[in-house]
Amino acid sequence: MKIAHPAFAGTLESSDLQVRIEPNNDGGIELVLDSTVEQRFGHAIRQVVLHTLDAMQVHDALVTIEDKGALDCVIRARVQAAVMRACDVQNIEWSQLS
């Protein structure tokens, strides 16, 4: 999927995260993480985000994450929502989302 414009998903409430995704003109995935649990779970959060982007075939994006202790399932859902909003997806293929 090609990121067409910036988009957000999520909140800054406890146990949630806010994802901002935008086109990366330099190419590739650039991930900026700000997390209350980064010291302990930063690597795992990055893995979930990158795996989700790879599964959605997003190869060029600047992703900024502000995490407040979200679980993996929430991270995946928020990244998926931000990507679909940034790509203007109208018909969601629910079977392709995991």
Swiss-Prot record:
Record localization: Cytoplasm
O-(phosphoribosyl dephospho-coenzyme A)serine found at: 14
Q: Does the record bear Phosphoprotein in its keywords?
A: yes
- Give the matching InterPro entries: CitD, Mal_deCO2ase/Cit_lyase_ACP
Q: Which UniProt keywords apply?
A: Cytoplasm, Phosphoprotein
Show the disulfide pairing.
none
Provide GO CC annotations from the record.
cytoplasm
Record-stated family: Belongs to the CitD family.
Tell me the NCBIfam families matching this sequence: citD, PRK13253.1
User: How is this protein organized at the quaternary level?
Assistant: Oligomer with a subunit composition of (alpha,beta,gamma)6.
Q: What does this protein do?
A: Covalent carrier of the coenzyme of citrate lyase.
Name this polypeptide is given: Citrate lyase acyl carrier protein
Q: Lineage of this protein's species?
A: Bacteria, Pseudomonadati, Pseudomonadota, Gammaproteobacteria, Vibrionales
Gene that this sequence comes from: citD
